[in-house]
Curated annotation (Swiss-Prot):
It is found in: Nucleus. Plays a role in pre-mRNA splicing and in the regulation of alternative splicing events. Activates exon skipping of its own pre-mRNA during muscle cell differentiation. Binds to the polypyrimidine tract of introns. May promote RNA looping when bound to two separate polypyrimidine tracts in the same pre-mRNA. May promote the binding of U2 snRNP to pre-mRNA. Cooperates with RAVER1 to modulate switching between mutually exclusive exons during maturation of the TPM1 pre-mRNA. Represses the splicing of MAPT/Tau exon 10. Residues 437-460 are annotated as: Disordered. The modification Phosphotyrosine is found at residue 127. Gene3D superfamilies: 3.30.70.330. The keyword Repressor applies. SUPFAM superfamilies: RNA-binding domain, RBD. One of its GO terms (cellular component) is nucleus. This is Polypyrimidine tract-binding protein 1. One of its GO terms (molecular function) is pre-mRNA binding. The modification N-acetylmethionine is found at residue 1. The gene is PTBP1. The modification Phosphoserine is found at residues 16, 141, 459.
Amino acid sequence: MDGIVPDIAVGTKRGSDELFSACVTNGPFIMSGTSASTANGNDSKKFKGDSRSAGVPSRVIHIRKLPGDVTEGEVISLGLPFGKVTNLLMLKGKNQAFIEMHTEEAANTMVNYYTSVTPVLRGQPIYIQFSNHKELKTDSSPNQARAQAALQAVNSVQSGNLALAASAAAVDAGMAMAGQSPVLRIIVENLFYPVTLDVLHQIFSKFGTVLKIITFTKNNQFQALLQYADPVSAQHAKLSLDGQNIYNACCTLRIDFSKLTSLNVKYNNDKSRDYTRPDLPSGDSQPSLDQTMAAAFGAPGIMSASPYAGAGFPPTFAIPQAAGLSVPNVHGALAPLAIPSAAAAAAAAGRIAIPGLAGAGNSVLLVSNLNPERVTPQSLFILFGVYGDVQRVKVLFNKKENALVQMADGSQAQLAMSHLNGHKLHGKPVRITLSKHQSVQLPREGQEDQGLTKDYGNSPLHRFKKPGSKNFQNIFPPSATLHLSNIPPSISEDDLKILFSSNGGIVKGFKFFQKDRKMALIQMGSVEEAIQALIDLHNHDLGENHHLRVSFSKSTI
């Protein structure tokens, strides 16, 4: 059966498809004015259901436990990622609906997906299964006008006819998006890795035409306002993406409709973009993040010219593919997502395989422009260890201004490169690129090395050896403010200030955490001083079996 629903007048329970006419047996259901009344819970007639098993695939899908105020558009949007929705029947009195997909394959994919991921509408979990009926046929009764208008509006958008979708006639006829904004407010929670404007554009443009994006930080949260060409696309994106992670276990999307109906973008840069106005100025003389990152990665530009192919969302976001299902013409979150190469560093936490970056050879970094008088394998191990588990370090014997650093994998290498490239170490800005080497070779026995090659494969100082470690949540770019932890009770503020100024650095500020005195923030005179202090003092023995832990902080004092 499609599920159990109470019969309002009689008080018995029966399969919901019994709402349909007794004359229907595995055939189309023709919606008449009388049965429309029944479908809305206003008639107590009993109908005999057919004998088909609800587990048998059908183009018609039965949806239960809908919120009382659900709109036609919200119901339609459940099916949109899987293909064209060809018909809709709303049973509002029963908090149920039936939708008909264009193909049985699309319906099968949809049911399989929602079996694994429970859909939520307006905060309420809903239930989806195959209907006993192979086809829905509806008449022109007034009760169906809203559903048909919403279907017409959505399908016109899918076919590119935005004029019809935007027409007042479609809205007035009951388009579910009436009065709804095409602007979404997006909050990215657990932002352990950078999420750029272009990453957002690639993700959200899979649901419709993105016109404008503005990104900003509010209440210490990365947020964005994103405007679609139409509210149907906004609804589709919200239903498909809200609560999903961009990368594994982090960067969670929280999406609501904005009160704004349009965005006013003045500048095209890494913070805001109007895709309808490529002529807008950048607003400052600094190169945009796009250009900087593209240069760092040796790429001509951030955006991939190819369509969505290559890297995918994490397995939780790619259930149809993981299950071996075919998803034809998927316009939603289930289609493969190509992450721009310059955003590769952001994918480190998710271990997403990015074409051209995920090979074993790409876990080795070439670090150049080092200070040959001061560089040591240990200093590079500590610094690069902020962004991953360093396996080996080799300072080149005949060219000590160059070194090779081997990370645990390619994604950690990308993360370290994106955060450290260009920062000053021992007075010189370091340059970091991917090495052509697949691994760092240890010196042969008897080979002169002067201790310039070190193997750290089993180091106890690895920050990320435990899966799901909280250290993944505390990876930030180098900054003048350092986060200190594992401080014993006997150590005072003055003790730490003296310690951090002992190597010539200037301590500009200090603050213990109010709720946990084992942690503190300390602000150095510059980012370069903070980098040096981290190298010198991470794992410093403070006594009482406490070794100081030092990392870069996102906060300031």
